[in-house]
Amino acid sequence: MARVKRGVTAHAKHKKVLKAAKGFYGRRKNTIRAAKAAVDRSKQYAYRDRKVNKRNFRALWIQRINAAVREFGLTYGRFIDGLNKAGIEVDRKVLSDMAIHEPEAFGALVNAAKKALEYLKETGTANEFEGAVR
């Protein structure tokens, strides 16, 4: 069996790592050892931050909804509770988008939530609420 030299493979691997390290500062973009460590770390950060990104967006949507709902005299928590009581299932991303781009439709949702909360306050139960979409 013929002897396999690893030079071509090693060179290809090094090129791949250095290409991934393009744009890094100092030795991290030139030397293979530093570049490999930096690329490995950057992949860990990317993995972690893909999860953090989802949390950040959810927090942003909640802040936007809260700001929009307060114009109608409700808090975010009361609004979400009212939507649940009314049987309206819309996620926070869509609610945030509606608050920005379709204020009339968002206002209708707020009024439905208010109505459900008032009905609950009057009767003490939300099970027989007429406006419920169940």
Curated annotation (Swiss-Prot):
Residue spans crossing the bilayer: none
One example GO MF annotation: structural constituent of ribosome
InterPro entries: Ribosomal_bL20, RIBOSOMAL_L20_CS, Ribosomal_protein_bL20_C
Keyword vocabulary terms for this entry: Ribonucleoprotein, Ribosomal protein, RNA-binding, rRNA-binding
GO biological process, one term: ribosomal large subunit assembly
Superkingdom field: Bacteria
PANTHER family reported in the protein's UniProt record: 39S RIBOSOMAL PROTEIN L20 (PTHR10986)
Family designation: Belongs to the bacterial ribosomal protein bL20 family.
Protein name: Large ribosomal subunit protein bL20
Organism: Rhizobium etli (strain CIAT 652)
Gene: rplT
